[in-house]
């Protein structure tokens, strides 16, 4: 005997399932009944197809304009043209006073700039990149590979002051030795302990050219003294994740299909524009099929040859021209059809915009930035869009670019202290090895926030500072500047103007006040109109 049970409003679904979360059930009408993805850990979902997924992302970045633009946006908005060090050792924890800390910071920043931005690229083992270029490459690498890798090296043959160098390592070179399968403690080229912490990395030689034997080198994560040996930065999504997932995974299929759609649309437009007119001839079905598919006997072949010869002789004597005002008579039975231009869009632009909005959401950038189309934006929507993207880029700067930069900076600072290029304050209660994080604490200033309306941006900064809600340091950092450099330059300029007998630039303040007044009046007029 079947035990009766309560059912939902549809008369089929059990009430228990209907009252619970619908995402785990069959869905309204059973749409979700065939959707049964396996429950997997991050590594189980990522690593089996890891190389293929990254290869597809590489192909997109190399051959797809929107993908290349997405990576370029990460580089320009996270790093910019100069990744500036703002050194801030934790002076309270280290037991030194603030004045000694600031003096030490100035010495360190001066020495670091000399080392990091050397035009001869002494910081790079390949002698191709400055420090800012390495950070830009790391951010790009993280965007389409989901992680970045840098090896700290020591140049024992150099005659330069600093021997510390760094080598950018492509994530595709980190793999299990001899391409063996993953094990509990070695996954995708990363040797881990039982807690999941990385102990070292297996890095293969460059695979080009392909006939060379492939060798793997094991590089520990840290040296016995605590100095970083291999820098591996990525943002894990859950526990147990060994390698990073690239940002294109969620939109890879759409980007590839959009690429195919664009090529097909372009081919269609070319075909439609290729023929200005066509000539039709009256042939019976059997003759036309023989001409198109080919003739088997010699009699049919001679008919085809004769017909083509007659047409060639006729049109050579009376060619069809569309550039003139006169069209001659055609061969009897032929007709001339002019091909009118057709709309090649046919709703394509709207569909492309929809796809690009989906792709932009998956990549963390705005549609306007990805498509480079700002034609349909007002100031308010542009500001909201820029702020959304800015929050995303600041997170990436903090957890990707700054982590790479801080670890590289720590390697150099250790050598600079050992070589006495900079001297630790005498009253510090911890040595560098005892408090690496405190001595290496630093902020990194990259590109500034995009200014939609320069006047309103400055007004906002002034009002925040005057209200005590912000500082010159924060507001200058938003613009990609160091407030200490700004202040020092202002002092120098004031002294030079005074020495040259020039009056203070009072016109600047007057112009600013006039601009504020005009902006307020425009806002009031707009409010009245609304």
From Swiss-Prot:
InterPro entries: Phage_lambda_portal. Its main location: virion. The record marks 19-20 as: Cleavage. GO terms for biological process: symbiont genome ejection through host cell envelope, long flexible tail mechanism; virion assembly. One of its GO terms (cellular component) is viral portal complex. It is found in: Virion. Transmembrane segments: none annotated. GO terms for molecular function: DNA binding; structural molecule activity. Proteolytically cleaved by the viral protease during capsid maturation. The keyword DNA-binding applies. Keywords: Capsid protein, DNA-binding, Viral capsid assembly, Viral genome ejection through host cell envelope, Viral genome packaging, Viral long flexible tail ejection system, Viral penetration into host cytoplasm, Viral release from host cell, Virion, Virus entry into host cell. It holds the Pfam family Phage_portal_2. The keyword Membrane does not apply. It comes from the Viruses. Homododecamer. Interacts with the terminase complex composed of two small and one large terminase subunits. Forms the portal vertex of the capsid. This portal plays critical roles in head assembly, genome packaging, neck/tail attachment, and genome ejection. The portal protein multimerizes as a single ring-shaped homododecamer arranged around a central channel. Binds to the terminase subunits to form the packaging machine. HAMAP family: PORTAL_LAMBDA (MF_04135). Belongs to the siphoviridae portal protein family. This is Portal protein.
